[in-house]
């Protein structure tokens, strides 16, 4: 459940959603774009969950909690200070274009980093599934709605509010892991 909520909050402020919306709008093939996005996030969240599963036995509970706190704070910084938008580029096959771009970009993604951290501190499979579902909901809305719908949302305000929520949760976990509260 934590991974699902975190993925919803983080992916809503992520440049990948606007990228998916732009490619779906330009290509006119929202289904292919959404399928490519789903394949990419399935791969990246599965790898994050498996990596978290194998890293978990090597850490005690407080470092695991501190790792989750660091992941949430990194995600909060991306929400408060938005990154550069991803340019759609020219691709003839929107499925492969989106799948490749999101898979390669997912290795440094904030959502996948939080999924990795949550997989280390709990049930890895549920963290991977939750991260996938949360990301799929946001990217599905972006692909089906297209660029015109996605552009009308107040992204700056959403980023500040969601980034603030993630920062509060991250600081709370960090202070808890350091036994300051």
Segments the model singles out, each with a brief description of its role:
Residues 2-3, 33, 65, 94-98, ...:
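Residue-level signature of transmembrane alpha-helical entry/exit and packing/kink sites
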Residues 17-19, 48, 136-148:
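Transmembrane alpha-helical segments of integral membrane proteins
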Residues 74-105:
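Alpha-helical multi-pass membrane helix bundles of inner-membrane/thylakoid proteins
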């Amino acid at each position: 459940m934590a991974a699902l909520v975190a993925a919803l909050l983080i992916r809503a402020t992520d440049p990948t959603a606007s990228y998916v919306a732009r490619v779906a709008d330009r290509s006119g093939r929202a289904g292919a774009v959404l399928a490519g996005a789903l394949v990419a996030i399935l791969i990246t969240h599965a790898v994050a969950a498996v990596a978290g599963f194998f890293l978990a036995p090597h850490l005690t509970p407080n470092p695991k909690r501190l790792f989750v706190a660091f992941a949430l704070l990194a995600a909060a910084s991306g929400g408060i200070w938005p990154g550069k938008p991803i340019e759609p580029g020219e691709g003839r096959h929107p499925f492969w274009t989106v799948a490749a771009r999101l898979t390669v970009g997912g290795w440094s993604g904030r959502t996948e980093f939080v999924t990795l951290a949550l997989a280390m501190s709990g049930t890895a499979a549920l963290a991977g599934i939750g991260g996938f579902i949360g990301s799929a909901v946001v990217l599905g809305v972006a692909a089906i709605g297209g660029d015109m719908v996605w552009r009308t949302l107040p992204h700056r305000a959403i980023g500040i509010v969601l980034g603030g929520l993630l920062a509060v949760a991250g600081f709370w976990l960090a202070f808890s892991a350091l036994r300051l509260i």
